[in-house]
Amino acid sequence: MPDHPLSSGVAFSHVPVLAETLMQVLSEQPPILWQNTAVIDATLGGGGHSKLILERFPGVRLVGLDQDPSARAAAASRLEPFLDRVQIVPVNFAAFEPPEPVSLVLADLGVSSPQLDVASRGFSFRLDGPLDMRMNPVAGGETAEEMIARLDVNALADLIYAFGEERLSRRIARRIKADLEAEGAYAGTAALAYAVAGCYPPKARRGRIHPATRTFQALRIAVNDELGVLDRLLQTAPGWLKPGGVLAIISFHSLEDRRVKTAFLQEERLERVTRKPFMASEQEQADNPRSRSAKLRIARRRPDTARSGP
């Protein structure tokens, strides 16, 4: 049962990315795979993908994992018609172990629209809010504000370069540390975004991609250990699957996609469904701009491998 009370007023709307493509691939698998079985949505979010899966496959029971309380509440509301087949677990997928082999593990690695659009979460450079960026503030942990204050200029530059692939990382880190020395702290996300944008030439500040995008990505990844968590999922998820079970991962930047691609190539228990990733159609990109960078990679558990750990 859900860990969170149902609420029809949860302000958490999320358009699932590459949903039609995912459902098409799942529908092409042997029908027996979806009979009297469990599936895992490792990044439940608002429950958009999960709702489609439950509608299409009445023989599945779904376990939804999410560490974000607002996401769990929204998913419980959206999935209310299926609650006899749904369990929502308040956990990061890196800390989960299913009690039985499953037919599907799905992970959508993107930050959801509600997280980006709620200023108080601190993820957005377009809306002013506290420099937080924690996926699960209730659990504690270091905020983005605390992290940039703790790191020296070289460590901060290395972080922005490694996790944001930001070519101006050293200039940005010097600006951040100079501002902190002069002001003590940034007033919020808007002040940090303004400082980062100021490190770019004027012409570069007017492009389609905001100049602060890569820096904010880097800080969010570091605050939540997103790549470490993904690595642990890629190590453990193949062992969760039944023979023929599907592992589907949607990534949104090259750091994630490279890890997924490499794992699918090197993991002996998996075989790729396609060599190249699925990407959003022009129509989906027009309807949902956040799908532009999405890549869906899908692999199957080889039928001749016994369930085991990494």
Swiss-Prot record:
EC number per UniProt: 2.1.1.199
Location of region: Disordered: 275-310
Record field: catalytic activity: cytidine(1402) in 16S rRNA + S-adenosyl-L-methionine = N(4)-methylcytidine(1402) in 16S rRNA + S-adenosyl-L-homocysteine + H(+)
Gene3D superfamilies documented for this protein: Putative methyltransferase TM0872, insert domain, Vaccinia Virus protein VP39
Keyword terms: Cytoplasm, Methyltransferase, rRNA processing, S-adenosyl-L-methionine, Transferase
Keyword presence, rRNA processing: yes
Superkingdom classification of source: Bacteria
GO molecular function, one term: rRNA (cytosine-N4-)-methyltransferase activity
Binding-site residues for S-adenosyl-L-methionine, renumbered to this chain: 47-49, 66, 93, 108, 115
Recorded coiled-coil stretches: none
Subcellular location as annotated: Cytoplasm
Pfam family, one: Methyltransf_5
One Gene Ontology biological process: rRNA base methylation
ATP-binding found in the keyword field: no
Top EC category: transferase
One CC-aspect GO term: cytoplasm
InterPro entries according to UniProt: RsmH, SAM-dep_MeTrfase_MraW_recog, SAM-dependent_MTases_sf
SUPFAM superfamilies from the UniProt entry: Putative methyltransferase TM0872, insert domain (SSF81799), S-adenosyl-L-methionine-dependent methyltransferases (SSF53335)
Biased composition regions of type Basic and acidic residues, renumbered to the chain: 301-310
Family: Belongs to the methyltransferase superfamily. RsmH family.
Biological role: Specifically methylates the N4 position of cytidine in position 1402 (C1402) of 16S rRNA.
Stated name of the protein: Ribosomal RNA small subunit methyltransferase H
Organism of origin: Synechococcus sp. (strain CC9311)
